[in-house]
Swiss-Prot record:
Catalytic reaction annotation: heme b + (2E,6E)-farnesyl diphosphate + H2O = Fe(II)-heme o + diphosphate
Annotated family: Belongs to the UbiA prenyltransferase family. Protoheme IX farnesyltransferase subfamily.
Gene assigned in the entry: ctaB
Primary location group: membrane
Name recorded for this polypeptide: Protoheme IX farnesyltransferase
Superkingdom in the source lineage: Bacteria
Keyword Iron-sulfur part of the UniProt annotation: no
Chain ranges passing through the membrane: 28-48, 52-72, 100-120, 122-142, 149-169, 176-196, 220-240, 241-261, 282-302
Miscellaneous field: Carbon 2 of the heme B porphyrin ring is defined according to the Fischer nomenclature.
A Gene Ontology BP annotation from the UniProt entry: heme O biosynthetic process
Annotated GO MF terms: protoheme IX farnesyltransferase activity
Cellular compartment(s): Cell inner membrane
Enzyme class of the recorded protein, top EC level: transferase
Species in which this protein is naturally found: Cupriavidus pinatubonensis (strain JMP 134 / LMG 1197)
């Protein structure tokens, strides 16, 4: 049934635009693009050229959205079974398979063009490889096959800082890979916290998520261990000399905060605590990368 709001042409267009936007998972895309932009700024001692910042950032945004649209398409039947995702237009059938494919192709093509014109071909192909890694390797091959899907497939989700760095420098040095490693090690504890408090949903989906295949306590142990590995990874920018004491202090404080969540969950789990830990993990990554940016321009390293 068409509601009064959607019966008006303008209302229908707005509603349809929101539905298409939902396919791109805007909140996840925003975090990815934020990390990519931080990578851009870290790649240069000065200001990022505006054409790269805007054109390159938009290109990465569009290709990320294209990958998420394919993810929604592939998982539409699974999403329909889960309370968290049943509202997605791909799951409800409001946007068809053909429409989703065309939408993804348009976003992907536009993103490739923007990166070619405003950044460089290295960034274009790296971003396209990231698109394939998420949309094909992770979504189609790994996610339904192994409870370690988020670990093995996490590289594609960790690539944005390297993409941003490449857009400015036309190179991906060790410093960029340190940023990738941070997100790579952050992803498992971030996602498994969600999988724990949504495990009833995932049990209905049939996906082999770690809390379903190995149980709550094993998952909590893995969250704790990966948190420790993540904290170690966050120290690499300081050890390597790319960041100073402002970043180090931020990384240690934020890491201790993250570890407190992981340890408390391990000792006394509750779904409410896991939900808070999941939400904090997003704030954690945002603040950590913001600290990298601040430190980059106001680096404090005491003279020895």
């Amino acid at each position: 049934m068409v509601t009064a709001t959607h019966s008006h042409p303008v209302g229908r267009v707005r509603h349809l635009a929101r539905q298409y936007a939902a396919l791109t998972k805007p909140r996840v895309t925003q975090l990815a693009v934020f990390c990519a932009i931080i990578g851009m700024f870290l790649a240069t001692p000065g200001m990022v050229p505006w054409r790269v910042l805007i054109g390159g950032g938009a290109g990465i945004w569009l290709l990320a959205g294209a990958a998420f649209a394919i993810n929604c398409l592939v998982e539409q039947k699974i999403d329909a079974l889960m309370r968290r995702t049943a509202w997605r237009p791909s799951a409800t059938g409001e946007i068809t398979t053909t429409q989703t494919l065309i939408f993804s192709a348009v976003l992907g093509g536009a993103g490739m063009w923007l990166l070619h014109v405003f950044a460089n071909d290295l960034t274009m192909w790296l971003t396209f490889a990231t698109f394939l890694g998420y949309a094909v390797v992770y979504t189609i091959l790994l996610k339904p096959a192994t409870p370690q899907n988020i670990v093995i497939g996490g590289l594609s989700g960790a690539m944005p800082p390297a993409l941003g760095w490449a857009a400015v420098a036309n190179d991906v040095p060790a410093e960029a890979w340190f940023l990738v490693l941070i997100i790579f090690t952050w992803t498992p504890p971030h996602f498994w916290a969600l999988a724990l408090y949504r495990r009833a949903d995932y049990a209905k989906s049939g996906l082999p998520m770690l809390p379903i295949t190995h149980g709550e306590k094993y998952t909590l142990l893995n969250i704790l261990l990966y948190t420790l590995v993540m904290i170690a990874a966050t120290l690499l920018p300081f050890v390597y000399g790319m960041s100073g004491y402002i970043y180090l202090a931020s990384a240690l404080v934020l890491g201790a905060w993250f570890l407190k969540y992981s340890w408390t969950m391990y000792r006394n789990y509750s779904d409410q605590l896991a939900q808070r830990a999941f939400r904090f993990s997003i704030l954690y990554l945002s603040l950590l990368f913001a600290a990298l940016l601040i430190d980059h321009y106001f680096k404090f390293v005491p003279q020895i």
